[in-house]
Amino acid sequence: MKSGSGGGSPTSLWGLVFLSAALSLWPTSGEICGPGIDIRNDYQQLKRLENCTVIEGFLHILLISKAEDYRSYRFPKLTVITEYLLLFRVAGLESLGDLFPNLTVIRGWKLFYNYALVIFEMTNLKDIGLYNLRNITRGAIRIEKNADLCYLSTIDWSLILDAVSNNYIVGNKPPKECGDLCPGTLEEKPMCEKTTINNEYNYRCWTTNRCQKMCPSVCGKRACTENNECCHPECLGSCHTPDDNTTCVACRHYYYKGVCVPACPPGTYRFEGWRCVDRDFCANIPNAESSDSDGFVIHDGECMQECPSGFIRNSTQSMYCIPCEGPCPKVCGDEEKKTKTIDSVTSAQMLQGCTILKGNLLINIRRGNNIASELENFMGLIEVVTGYVKIRHSHALVSLSFLKNLRLILGEEQLEGNYSFYVLDNQNLQQLWDWNHRNLTVRSGKMYFAFNPKLCVSEIYRMEEVTGTKGRQSKGDINTRNNGERASCESDVLRFTSTTTWKNRIIITWHRYRPPDYRDLISFTVYYKEAPFKNVTEYDGQDACGSNSWNMVDVDLPPNKEGEPGILLHGLKPWTQYAVYVKAVTLTMVENDHIRGAKSEILYIRTNASVPSIPLDVLSASNSSSQLIVKWNPPTLPNGNLSYYIVRWQRQPQDGYLFRHNYCSKDKIPIRKYADGTIDVEEVTENPKTEVCGGDKGPCCACPKTEAEKQAEKEEAEYRKVFENFLHNSIFVPRPERRRRDVLQVANTTMSSRSRNTTVADTYNITDPEEFETEYPFFESRVDNKERTVISNLRPFTLYRIDIHSCNHEAEKLGCSASNFVFARTMPAEGADDIPGPVTWEPRPENSIFLKWPEPENPNGLILMYEIKYGSQVEDQRECVSRQEYRKYGGAKLNRLNPGNYTARIQATSLSGNGSWTDPVFFYVPAKTTYENFMHLIIALPVAILLIVGGLVIMLYVFHRKRNNSRLGNGVLYASVNPEYFSAADVYVPDEWEVAREKITMNRELGQGSFGMVYEGVAKGVVKDEPETRVAIKTVNEAASMRERIEFLNEASVMKEFNCHHVVRLLGVVSQGQPTLVIMELMTRGDLKSYLRSLRPEVENNLVLIPPSLSKMIQMAGEIADGMAYLNANKFVHRDLAARNCMVAEDFTVKIGDFGMTRDIYETDYYRKGGKGLLPVRWMSPESLKDGVFTTHSDVWSFGVVLWEIATLAEQPYQGLSNEQVLRFVMEGGLLDKPDNCPDMLFELMRMCWQYNPKMRPSFLEIIGSIKDEMEPSFQEVSFYYSEENKPPEPEELEMELELEPENMESVPLDPSASSASLPLPERHSGHKAENGPGVLVLRASFDERQPYAHMNGGRANERALPLPQSSTC
């Protein structure tokens, strides 16, 4: 892969060459740019694209952190990118359509990790917008982590790519938040064409004003012009003239001298995968990516940078390649610095792939972990060293086997003394090479060995013989005293006497070793390792720092001196070959005499076979109504020679739960999905012999993941690493590896015995409810030498379980593996849901008829319902008949038919969909006689009188009951004008709030509201003395019904009555025309719940904001209480007070939100009780949960929960409890716990709001009065509490009202000292009256005083009326 560069050197090199050729090879309107363009850090680098028609290479646009207006940058000439397009972290770019309006083809000749289009972390990108992009000829797309990117679900990528299975589109803006609209759909004049994606038939477009281009079906795979005329077959993407290969926008195969051709003409060569060039052109291209200056080569009709694998240049003067003899040589070396010093793994990396080292090799590795395997990886291909080899002070080396291919040391340059192989002072070196498998020649020079205490002299002498240097060295060149003095160099051979194997254990014994002095033998060490091939040596993978590929076990000497030592090796893998050898541990030197050692030859032994592991990645797809295609991968551990697979399948019974539903109810039709084609059907079915027969015929289950999905999961972590390494100008902190999804759970028993079922009686009856409990038999087949099969003769649209077992050569004795299984459903059969027989009818009394029909004999799964379409000549009516009703009556009755001629047709609906309509049946309903009408009148008149009298009695009873309830003190139910409670018959009438549509401008989306999208915009003249005002604009979804539009406007009408600083204001309404708009005060910081969560310290983007202090919490509480006090004063019960329904302004003021806006966004905060609407149970008071009573007292309870949300930064109340548990917990008197670090003052206020008796809770005015001293000074200027509207009545008036309405508990102040039936005025706290404000009740009762209304506390033990806390400075 080519690496990008921020500079211009490679681009300039290409540019010099291409500039002269561009005019002759492409239309004169532009030029060919290459070899790839990298634009980063500075948006002005985009000017490099100004004249580009084709980018021959890649295009990177990345790491531009400064947001700019890109509208001034437009590159209409660019039509083709030959490799890939990559965009990453470009701030401010909202669409690619303006940048590249005519980009038509991305060829994908070279890919960015399998992708031709990558859009990654583009934070401001709103749409892709490449409306002229017609083809991505190779590779997939990856669009990931673009938080604001929409219009992804409206693009049909299958029209652009040949295959979409490898596309990766994850982490972008959720489609339901996008509101994607294709051109014309809002005006109900759609301009775009429709296609089907994931079973959704919808319009396809790039943006709100650009459709996705589709060619007529007559063109097939050919491109087309803008006028939908078919292009020449050699054109790709588009063309200017039909059937003309000289006017193509891009070529399907190759471009040569203005013409698109299927192959390059003789004398020309393919270049960069898309055009033809001659030999002179290829010879003059500088190789910008090669370390030498040999230029490009010609091979197999293509002009390329380097010879392909297995080929080498014929000579340095030739442009042609010839096959290598063996591995292709790679010469390394520096003419100036002839000695290559290897002192670390890093320096060894420079020799990776080298086969010939021109110069000398000096190895000086003093330390390092796992050094041997690393050196072998980087130096293992070296065959020839032209100079000398010197190994000194390399204490980390045990062996030189890492130079596994070294065969020749030329010695053209030698050390002083004519040494060409020099080994000095290597304290742990024990082996040079395995001379049984090594041929090494030292052509010139001598060898020198000194101070290698563990290297036996015999090893050095053996090298003399193999390398042909014997006789060259003098006596002092190989020092026998300081080489091998610490090693057991003269070894006896230990011989194994017995071996016994199991599947995971080996027992070995060997002859007893007897040194001259038994005391010199200390113990034995057994070495063993996995050895797939019989080519291991004792020193493989060893270094002096402890790395060793061998496992070691110490064996003590047997107590009996005559006994044979042995060892049990356990924890081994089944059916695995192991290499084992034994070494005696002896004293190496006693009084300067060498002690003979002992070790065995390497023994190769294989463990026994065992049951295989389960097959992997079982997938199934259906290609017809009677077949399932099954594919899997071999087991990870065959534990033997894998011989065959057992495939077993079982039809699953229908889900009885489905049968209990009445599918005539709305939204009851289940998801219909069969096992769609997730694997290559042609590949599986190419051999009909793999089919197996026999079988039988259940509800949809989750489909198994496709191969593409699994591959995408595997590649994700690796892709991220490659991608982040590529962006070398940025610093990344890699995320922890994502865990792979667990494999399917399988049975924990092996299949040691099997019964083969070949036939089964078909007793299935769709009308029999017992079939829901049926246990169907398994069928079985053996599959040899393949990991796929086709199961035939299955029932249509039926669920099957398919088990796959692995079996190896020992299956007859050990059994097969446990199963891996998959569930799959066959496709529906055409016509299976049609009603087979004629529809008959019988007349019934009272203008009714009874229709009868037979059920489908073998439907697609379960019959859910029948639909009857009947009518006279005027209009058809429809009647739904549930399956249960049909089974009960054998048909359906049509009632209250008017006299006349009728036709009726019937259609069955199964799990897979609808059947065909039956042929019409004709019937006649006669008119009633006069006598019948008279009798009906006689019967109906008394019934009507009884119904009227009964209705009056019920009304009187309800009125009396309601009046008595109001006297019991259980709360007053105010008539609420909440927008959920209004008559749908109300019709909105424009008034002075109407705003002209042209005064409104929408800018950006804010979020989804109850009725539709909410936008930020600008309104002109809606606020006095402000020419323009930033506003929030609420809209209605285009699919909304008339009722919903009326609800939307009437909700706005409620807001017209409110004029309070702490309630979000309505600014205007646009009701004329479509869409309907409601203009609200803009609350830039969103809802209080989101705002509080953004203050959490762990939030990623919270770099400035800090959690609120106590004074800020009290300020929020006071502002919310002031807004609620205003609503209470206007006889409005909110019913849904919560942090999500409060809004935060630019100056951090908290206001009561416009009602209903957040109900969709926080849908999980609501709970549907029984068949009722959604209820916010976690914020509701006990009386509201029990009786559905909503009063200002219940709003106070909710206010206490809001205080708890403020203190916890918007945690969910009653965390850990389900909605049903919360409902019971609150009704039984449970309360929220005190939040961590919550000030006592705030928690006491919460507890006061959560008094079980509604009358014991303070009013909102009392709450404000208790904390008014803590509020900011501006609160007095803007609040309802201090306004003239809240001026309290005179004491005489209040006392008179109390005497006149003693049962009105709403007006009774909560005075703890009240103990008599008379209700005198409470005293003002400290005898003072608030300035510019009402008198305030401050509840400071002593707990020793008698508590009021103690009998009304719901029977809760030790319940006390908590006083409102005294405010204090934070």
Curated annotation (Swiss-Prot):
It holds the Pfam family Furin-like. Residues 1322-1331 have a biased composition (Basic and acidic residues). It is found in: Cell membrane. The modification Phosphoserine is found at S1279, S1283. Glycans are attached at residues 51, 102, 135, 245, 314, 418, 439, 535, 608, 623, 641, 748, 757, 765, 901, 914. One of its GO terms (molecular function) is insulin receptor substrate binding. Residues 742-936 are extracellular. The keyword Aminoacyl-tRNA synthetase does not apply. The active site is at D1136. PROSITE patterns: FN3, PROTEIN_KINASE_ATP, PROTEIN_KINASE_DOM, PROTEIN_KINASE_TYR, RECEPTOR_TYR_KIN_II. Disulfide bonds join C33-C52, C150-C178, C182-C205, C192-C211, C215-C224, C219-C230, C231-C239, C235-C248, C251-C260, C264-C276, C282-C303, C307-C321, C324-C328, C332-C354, C456-C489. GO terms for cellular component: alphav-beta3 integrin-IGF-1-IGF1R complex; axon; caveola; glutamatergic synapse; insulin receptor complex; intracellular membrane-bounded organelle; membrane; neuronal cell body. There is a cross-link at K1169, K1172 (Glycyl lysine isopeptide (Lys-Gly) (interchain with G-Cter in ubiquitin)). ATP binds at L1006, G1007, Q1008, G1009, S1010, F1011, G1012, M1013, V1014, K1034. Residues 1-30 form the signal peptide. InterPro entries: FN3_dom (IPR003961), FN3_sf (IPR036116), Furin-like_Cys-rich_dom (IPR006211), Furin_repeat (IPR006212), Growth_fac_rcpt_cys_sf (IPR009030), Ig-like_fold (IPR013783), Kinase-like_dom_sf (IPR011009), Prot_kinase_dom (IPR000719). Autophosphorylated on tyrosine residues in response to ligand binding. Autophosphorylation occurs in trans, i.e. one subunit of the dimeric receptor phosphorylates tyrosine residues on the other subunit. Autophosphorylation occurs in a sequential manner; Tyr-1166 is predominantly phosphorylated first, followed by phosphorylation of Tyr-1162 and Tyr-1167. While every single phosphorylation increases kinase activity, all three tyrosine residues in the kinase activation loop (Tyr-1162, Tyr-1166 and Tyr-1167) have to be phosphorylated for optimal activity. Polyubiquitinated at Lys-1169 and Lys-1172 through both 'Lys-48' and 'Lys-29' linkages, promoting receptor endocytosis and subsequent degradation by the proteasome. Ubiquitination is facilitated by pre-existing phosphorylation. Residues 1000-1275 form the Protein kinase domain. SUPFAM superfamilies: Fibronectin type III, Growth factor receptor domain, L domain-like, Protein kinase-like (PK-like). Tetramer of 2 alpha and 2 beta chains linked by disulfide bonds. The alpha chains contribute to the formation of the ligand-binding domain, while the beta chain carries the kinase domain. Interacts with PIK3R1 and with the PTB/PID domains of IRS1 and SHC1 in vitro when autophosphorylated on tyrosine residues. Forms a hybrid receptor with INSR, the hybrid is a tetramer consisting of 1 alpha chain and 1 beta chain of INSR and 1 alpha chain and 1 beta chain of IGF1R. Interacts with ARRB1 and ARRB2. Interacts with GRB10. Interacts with RACK1. Interacts with SOCS1, SOCS2 and SOCS3. PANTHER family: INSULIN-LIKE GROWTH FACTOR 1 RECEPTOR, TYROSINE-PROTEIN KINASE RECEPTOR. This is Insulin-like growth factor 1 receptor. The lineage of its organism: Eukaryota, Metazoa, Chordata, Craniata, Vertebrata. The gene is Igf1r.
